[in-house]
UniProtKB/Swiss-Prot annotation:
It comes from the Eukaryota. The gene is GLU7. One of its GO terms (molecular function) is carbohydrate binding. PANTHER family: ENDO-1,4-BETA-GLUCANASE. It is found in: Secreted. Keywords: Carbohydrate metabolism, Cell wall biogenesis/degradation, Cellulose degradation, Glycoprotein, Glycosidase, Hydrolase, Polysaccharide degradation, Secreted, Signal. It comes from Oryza sativa subsp. japonica (Rice). It catalyses: Endohydrolysis of (1->4)-beta-D-glucosidic linkages in cellulose, lichenin and cereal beta-D-glucans. This is Endoglucanase 1. Its EC number is 3.2.1.4.
């Protein structure tokens, strides 16, 4: 019942590169049908994926509310703190408003509209999608009452999770938690800046005054995030076990700068993206996960887009390094990475990361693959490929095919023949872990449901939820394609806004049957830009040198070899120091000397490397004959 506590697992910067897997064959492009396999009605699924957000609304519901079983809720949010925090979205199956995943949700909804707004319009859904973006953006304007103040949470996860109540009946804490210069949160402030920058583009043509308001808040939040650095879960410990910032704030600062460049064309933000790529990890980290915590692949795809569109300015060399990491992400999803970090697959072909809400990563990856493929294809034949470490280069069409196969799996083309989108197809989850959907609607029975009565009378019911949570995507199956439709099985049946937000973009793309209309290309940019002088780009200073085997022995018919290696900081004298250096070693067998096992993946150098310094390490490999050295690569580092 905790949030994506598994999203803690989400934050791995992931082992990259790995074992080749076979890309599952995919079904035809535009299709009709229901959950259970074969062809799918992407337009219907798109409509439902957007409709779901109306079930997650907090605050005073509008007159055009389509989810009729919901009513007003959270009407005193922020009152005790002297600020109006009414509105926004509940994150998943509970009644807390967590700012971090909500901001990522708004970012991905806005990006979906920007890339595939024309397809949404053709399906009659663009207005609904823009309403969904605005519902979140309006809340973040309220949550940012001063340049260096941001409210990041309303409610308390601990007290909320001991209650099972409709949001309309809430009796749990509605305390609000904030960031300020004494309590910084660069990750949360950076992601909120990103959401508002992306949302400003959505409304640039239809409501320029509102768009400018969003952009002003975005700029202030970015400056706040950059000037007062720190992790938001250190300033707001109450959030740590629900939506902890495990990847740190470097990705959000780069993410925000990239989106502000997209929204303004102001070279200040492009310079920031380029000049901080090493220090904040954008050019160093390569990962196979993308979600509410880890934004690096999103930054890298966006940087690649700038490069492909000729918007790199003097920073083409640095943006190419970003693009190489975007390629690593794509290749890892395709099973064409190298070194042991490909995304796993279930027997039925679903990309698989973890048991808790795995589909959040599937929808996020599918969106990035589709967007990256479309921009590669738009750039021309010579650039419409991704070069992978293991296996032949991948065409843009392969990325789209993979994204489509994952969406088809979610909609029912899977071994169980079940749609993991509630309300789509004949077979779908009937007992989603969701308080509002699982208790009789307050409109049907206005009798108060207490904290404990909800558990006693509704949570444990064997029957289907009384209210249809139409369009919600649940956590999904396990690594063997297994799924138990039980309300208490929150790892598989809980829904989340960030599962749906990227999916709506992919569904629009598939419903349109072709490449995105790139709606943002027609949006008029402000012309009062301030151009700052560029700073020089630099190549990565970290270098690994593999040495010969230093020892060899046999055991149980296998040969073992110990190999030595050195890692060096090639920065010139007086240059920057390398810290938090993470190194990947492909399948060592035995101890590793000179490095420490990292908390989640790979190994970490226990000390920093000043300019010109080197450090030695060693590892063991085994084989039938004389085993060669393992693949060794730099996962990431910081320059200080």
């Amino acid at each position: 019942m905790a949030r994506r506590g598994g999203a803690a697992a989400s934050s791995s910067m992931a082992n990259l590169l790995g074992v080749a897997l076979v890309l599952a064959a995919t079904a035809q492009t535009s299709a009709r049908g229901g959950g259970g396999g074969g062809r799918h009605d992407y337009r219907m699924a798109l409509s439902k994926s957007i409709l779901y957000f109306e079930a997650q609304r907090s605050g005073v519901l509008p007159g055009n509310q389509r989810i009729a079983w919901r009513a007003n809720s959270g009407l005193a949010d922020g009152k005790a703190n002297g600020v109006d925090l009414v509105g926004g979205y509940y994150d998943a199956g509970d009644n807390v408003k967590f700012g971090f995943p909500m901001a990522f949700t708004v970012t991905m909804m806005a990006w979906s509209v920007l890339e595939y707004g024309k397809q949404m319009a053709a399906a009659g859904e663009l207005g609904h999608a823009m309403d969904a973006v605005r519902w979140g953006a309006d809340y973040f304007v309220k949550a940012h009452p001063a340049p260096n103040v941001l409210y990041g949470e309303v409610g308390d996860g601990d007290s909320d999770h001991v209650c099972w109540q409709r949001p309309e009946d809430m009796t749990t804490s509605r305390q609000a938690y904030r960031l300020d210069p004494q309590h910084p949160g660069s990750d949360l402030a950076g992601e909120t800046a990103t959401a508002l920058a992306a949302a400003s583009l959505v409304f640039r043509s239809s409501n320029p005054g509102y768009a400018n308001q969003l952009l002003q808040h975005s700029k202030q939040l970015f400056d706040f995030a950059d000037k007062y650095r720190g992790k938001y879960d250190d300033s707001m410990p109450v959030v740590k076990k629900f939506y902890g910032s495990f990847s740190g704030y470097g990705d959000e600062l780069l993410w925000a700068s990239a989106w502000l460049y997209q929204a303004t064309d102001n070279r200040r933000y492009l310079d920031y993206l380029a000049n901080n790529g090493d220090a904040l990890g954008g050019t160093g980290w390569a990962t196979n996960e993308f979600g509410w915590d880890v934004k690096y692949p999103g930054v890298q795809v966006l940087a690649a887009k700038f490069l492909l569109q000729g918007k790199a300015g003097p920073h083409a060399a640095v943006l190419r390094r970003y693009q190489r990491n975007a390629d690593v992400f794509a290749c890892s999803c395709l099973g064409k990475g190298g070194g042991g970090g490909n995304v796993g697959r279930t027997p039925g072909g679903l990309m698989y990361h973890q048991g808790w809400n795995n589909l959040q990563f599937v929808t996020g990856a599918s969106f990035l693959l589709a967007v990256y493929a479309d921009h590669l294809a738009a750039a021309g034949r010579g650039q419409a490929v991704v070069r992978c470490q293991a296996g032949p280069a991948a065409r843009a069409s392969e990325l789209v095919a993979l994204a489509k196969s994952q969406v088809d799996y979610i909609l029912g083309s899977n071994p169980r023949g079940i749609s993991y989108m509630v309300g789509y197809g004949a077979r779908y989850p009937r007992r989603a872990h969701h308080r509002g959907a699982s208790i009789v609607s307050i409109r049907a029975n206005p009798s108060f449901v207490s904290c404990k009565d909800g558990y006693a009378s509704w949570f444990g019911r064997a029957g289907s939820n009384p209210n249809l949570l139409d369009g919600a995507v649940v956590g999904g199956p396990d690594g063997r394609d297994g799924f138990a439709d039980e309300r208490n099985n929150y790892q598989q049946t809980e829904v989340a806004t960030y599962n749906n937000a990227p999916l709506m973009g992919v569904l629009a793309r598939l419903a349109g049957g072709g490449r995105g209309g790139l709606a943002e290309a027609a949006i008029k940019r402000p012309d009062n830009q301030t151009l700052l002088p560029p700073l020089a780009a630099a190549a990565s200073p970290v270098e690994i040198t593999q040495l010969n085997a230093t020892a060899s022995w046999k055991k149980d018919g296998r040969t073992y070899r110990r190999y030595a290696a050195t890692v060096s900081n090639r920065s010139p004298a007086g240059g920057k120091t390398v810290e938090e250096l993470h190194i990947g070693i492909g399948k060592p067998h035995g101890p590793v000397w000179g490095l420490e096992k990292a908390a989640r993946y790979g190994y970490v150098l226990p000390s920093s490397l000043a300019a010109g310094e080197s450090a030695a390490f060693a590892y063991v490999v085994r084989g039938r004959a004389a085993p060669p050295p393992a693949d060794v690569w730099v996962i990431g580092y910081k320059l200080v």
